[in-house]
Amino acid sequence: MRKFTFRLWAVLMLMLVSLQTMATDTFTSNRTDFRDESIYFMMTTRFYDGDTGNNVLCWDNQSEQIKTKDPCWRGDFQGVIDKLDYIKALGFTAIWITPVVQNASGYDYHGYHAMDFQHVDCRYQSSDGSKDGDAMFQELIDKAHEKGIKIILDIVLNHTGNFGEQTLCKEFDRNTDLATQALINACMIPNEEKLGSDYLTSVPYEQYQRRLGLLKNVRGKNEDVHNYWHHFGDFNWDFPNRWWAQIAGDCVDLNTENDYVADYLVKCYGSFIKMGVDGFRIDTSGHISRLTFCKQFIPQFTALGKQYEDKRLNKAPFFMYGEVCARYSDVTYRGQDNLSCYYYTWQAPQELLDKWDGSQKYWDTQVLFDKANGGTGVDDHQMALCESDNAPTPTSDNTFMVNGKWHEPDYSQASGFHVIDFPLHYNFGNAAAAYGLAKSGDNRYNDATYNVVYVDSHDYGPQQTNDQFRFSGDDAQWAENLSLMFTFRGIPCLYYGSEVGFRRGAPIDRGPHGPLSETGRAYFGGYLTGDVEAKDFGDYTATGNVAATLNHDVAQHLIRLNKIRQAVPALRKGQWTDDGCTPADGGIAFKRAYKNDSYALVAINGGATFTDCPDGTYTDVVTGKTYTGSTITVDAPATQGQLRVLVKDWKGGQIGEDGPFIYNETPKS
């Protein structure tokens, strides 16, 4: 009898494992909706050094780089390739990498100071010279796809660096020999006809003024005769004139309202779509008007995505999301719709699009100077047209369940462009604040289930006491935020190292004023030495430091959350409501539904009571317990990050093992 009972138990366990394996296989092969993804965000040069021979010092702050043995250009594409299994072991299905195009500035390891949009930076080439940066990037895309991982490329449309741009205004020839890259005068050969024969002997300030003058008309004469750059001077971060202004010395504002400029950018970045990148994260989107996006970029990139869909993993639709920076605690940025994140998710009015005139013929009639040089920096038509795009947006129930059910969303007014959820990010000092903001503001987005959600990044942390620092919360606070991110609406995104609290509370960026090792952009490679092999998302074997990294409490929490999210379509793509949800102990509770196929009840930081639940059997994928009835009460310890996910008609049993934050009755480290 004992043998029979044991055999029956073994068969049942095998059936449960088989059902979960089938669900995983279905998820892996059917990821054609980007909401299926979870994103790991890295600064490529700071992640992992896979080719030590191509390390390069930035031009500025070289003494600190040498002293700390930490060249800014340290991580590389080979390093990402080598650690794809690490990212897969964590359960992440997509990688967002910082910009790859050729850069030029004193501190350009991050990639946001372009001098040539047509080529991958030469500092990404292999050290033996056999593969240039373009070839190495193609290899990364291909290797990632082989692992079932998508690549999101960070791109910049808003600006160049201040060393010109090789097509729009060529100021330098670039020597791409790797050995010359740490020496500015060895790798940057000035165009003396444009910059003067005494350029190299001039003081740095004079060199900068000469370079900038060719782009910005700041020397009292019209040097940018075709208006490839904007010429607006003083601006206010809180006014639409932020669309026309140079936001930093190394960020020279491109005239994206000029068709020639926009077409050139589309052509350059289109080559990466052709290579097979799966999506774009678009930098400084909030410094470009919505009208410009809807006219110049979104339709064009969407068409290119369709043209080259065979290059992408699973032929999924090309995905784009933008950084509409809104360092503000409310969903509407300082009372202004057209500067708010949600505004960009809606299509611009057709009557304004029809008035567009970005032709070179028009722009060649405009001679523009900023106020300091006797002008206004404002053209006769285009800028005013963009600023007239300021009508209040509609509201939408695309994010929400209606009458307790999923409903077909209405995308007839959608722009096709999605956003980083800056309001949630800014409120992620704790999960309750972020969730509360979503309750009041999700109707402003066309569909907030497409928002990319993170706690902190390479630019800002949440507004704790100062957003210039990486999130300073302890592991339990991380667990709480992550439990919400991976079960609530939106696409979860994690900044590299957060899985172990890396550089917790550190200043995010100090520029060339001190070593990178003391900032939130420190080198992470020491945590990744050793070997890791991922058989599937969240299923791995590892040795060395990388094994210890993966075994960190927060990393293990992430692995389980990724598994739960991947198993339940409602958590990835579902609409939500808190109707009929009463959390216990000050926690959070909501319902998620996707079509007629997936329905889940979620409780965070404790238990909850759910009413008006559809008939069926609900299985808590955290504990394996089952519930029935239209009113369901689930108990759970009232601890940070605690989670219950009751899935209707679920057949697979418990997902993952108890840990320090998610568990049945007793935490396990």
Residue ranges and their predicted role:
Residues 1-9:
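Bacterial N-terminal signal peptides that target proteins for export
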Residues 21-23:
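Boundary at the C-terminal end of the N-terminal hydrophobic targeting segment
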Residues 31-37, 45-275, 297-307, 318-333, ...:
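Substrate-binding/active-site clefts of carbohydrate-active enzymes
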Residues 38, 629-668:
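C-terminal beta-strand-rich structural cap/linker in extracellular carbohydrate-active enzymes
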Residues 38-43, 93-99, 113-119, 150-154, ...:
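Structural recognition of the beta-strand scaffold that forms the well-ordered cores
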Residues 141, 159, 191, 267-274, ...:
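Active-site-proximal helices and loops of the catalytic beta/alpha 8
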Residues 250, 448-471:
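Active-site clefts of carbohydrate-active enzymes
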